[in-house]
Amino acid sequence: MHCLPLTLLLLLLCSRAEAEEIIGGTESKPHSRPYMAHLEILTLRNHLASCGGFLIRRNFVLTAAHCAGRFIMVTLGAHNIQKKEDTWQKLEVIKQFPHPKYDDLTLRHDIMLLKLKEKANLTLAVGTLPLSPQFNFVPPGRMCRVAGWGKRQVNGSGSDTLQEVKLRLMDPQACRHYMAFDHNLQLCVGNPRKTKSAFKGDSGGPLLCAGVAQGIVSYGQNDAKPPAVFTRISHYRPWINKVLKQNKA
């Protein structure tokens, strides 16, 4: 079964999978998700792309490793990404830290830290998001939330405004059709009997369970049928802490 990474590629000329967006969700209340980051990316193939991400320190954003590029500009404090507001903060990424074991074929270890050129100013529209502890286990059946600027329809375009959707954490067996799925590294998210999912353009965004980031949008099926695969943050807390410490975050 063909899978595709959830990176919102705006030029659909390459054979790579694209990013995810929110399908079956609703528009977020403006600035109710102050940790959300919109990433504008010049890819390694010189294409334009976009992803989601989230602020975890004033100068660090967490996202998916498949969102890496030659150049990344981060916008914080946005709701409608096409209408600039006084709440916006645009910050250049000066260093990218993809996980050293990231595999571009299997999309395992699909996690990356981005160091910003300047520290963000924390406001009502810009804030940080707490991460799952290392040994935190979120049981199947838990309802969580995902937000992003991705597509709202399989054949549609990306959303200008931030969208969000409630998704159910599934038993790992529900993702057994994904050959590279590893429940130790990843989460299986989205009820296959529903039409709600993250889709193209949502890659890198957070999965929130009880106000804590438990996952990162990674990949799903090219028809957006759930479940999709999310990177399990708790597994990577030692690596995240190491990078932050070494870079004085």
Swiss-Prot record:
SMART domains: Tryp_SPc
Disulfide bonds: 51-67, 144-209, 175-188
PROSITE patterns: TRYPSIN_DOM, TRYPSIN_HIS, TRYPSIN_SER
Protein's GO biological process: protein maturation; proteolysis
UniProt GO molecular function: serine-type endopeptidase activity
Subcellular location: Secreted; Cytoplasmic granule
Catalytic site positions: 66, 110, 203
Keyword Secreted tagged: yes
Domain of life: Eukaryota
Catalysed conversion reaction: Preferential cleavage: Phe-|-Xaa > Tyr-|-Xaa > Trp-|-Xaa > Leu-|-Xaa
Propeptide, chain numbering: 20-21
Transmembrane segments: none
Main localization (coarse): secreted
Keyword Nucleotide-binding: no
Residue intervals of the Peptidase S1 domain: 22-245
Enzyme class: hydrolase
Homology family: Belongs to the peptidase S1 family. Granzyme subfamily.
Job of this protein: Major secreted protease of mast cells with suspected roles in vasoactive peptide generation, extracellular matrix degradation, and regulation of gland secretion.
Protein name: Chymase
